[in-house]
Amino acid sequence: MDYSEVVGKLVSCPEECGMCCLCQPEVLPEERPFFKKNYPQFLVRTKGPNPYNALALKKGCGSCVFLENRRCKVYDHRTAYCRQYPYHLYASDRIKVELDLSCRGAWYGTGNDAVSESKALIKAAEPRIEQALSESKEVYREFFANCKEAGVYQDPSMLRMTVSENASMFADLGYLSRIMDMSTIEPIMAIAGIRPETNLDMASLEEAGRELAMDSMSSSDPLSVPVYCDKDWNWNMFMAANGRIEWSVMDDEGDLQHKAFANAENIKLKVPDADGRKVLIDYVNTLNQRDSFMGSVFSIMDMNGYEDDMTNSYFGSMAVTVMDLMWRMSMLDHFMGTGVGAEGVREAIIFYDMDRLDAPTIGAFV
């Protein structure tokens, strides 16, 4: 068990928020009898390739049907997945607790001790963890064997050490540009000693960041687009289509209220100022230690048929992740004036991190 991400953290659950209730929770077999007996009309099967039992959402796309005035009506019987938020238990060749930074309560430095809460959640999830860990260990063993056979294996701990030693590069547009180029050109790239790009092609960088961010917003289904809970506890949603972004707010009844449109090309890529850069570097270091981030890189390598060296895949993925985040920061500033300082970067992370944790991975969240 690895608790390093939550050591020293305090986490609260703001009463006005309710953002986690926009996520449709799975109902485990042992939880099903309560809902089947008392609320059978609110038990549903999800759509998709791997359907599961879940609680219904208001109008099929809003918050959970049990959320009323931002309070849960079945709080004492809420599902395991509701209880776990904002903690994510990731199974690889070990279990690592990761903290969802889209939860505003993770930023205030008040509330309950995160390690104590995590340990209680892990104890409650022991049967599921045992099975998930057994399966994920085998997946990782097979993945590493495939990497070695293809000649693309590198020591993950060394990759992490390199990023840790050079984290500031991933918060600098000149270095990001260079790293992204090298990751696609060099057989096995190295970032130690590289120099930043001095003649930046801003049009290409803006296009890269825009495409990354808009890809996640390209759905007309509110369940499939990023959600940003702002400081006033509004559930903001952004949908991209035909080169435009629509900003809407989901209300407590499950209806979308239109706020504004913007042509995506009119949103210019901005970079954090000195204070914002510090927050961004901290986030890079957080991602660098997450097993789920490493697992998402491994998933990309597997989908690409083990063509790229693990070094290029890892450094390149970190760089494009930051580009996505920077463009989202720029978009929030365009619509809401959040800025590019420490607060602006924090708001962008709050907007982004849940999607980051939802990225495909070879491991599993328990």
Regions found by a protein language model. Name each.
Residues M1-M19, Q24-G62, F66-R71, D76-V366:
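Short loop/turn segments that flank or connect secondary-structure elements
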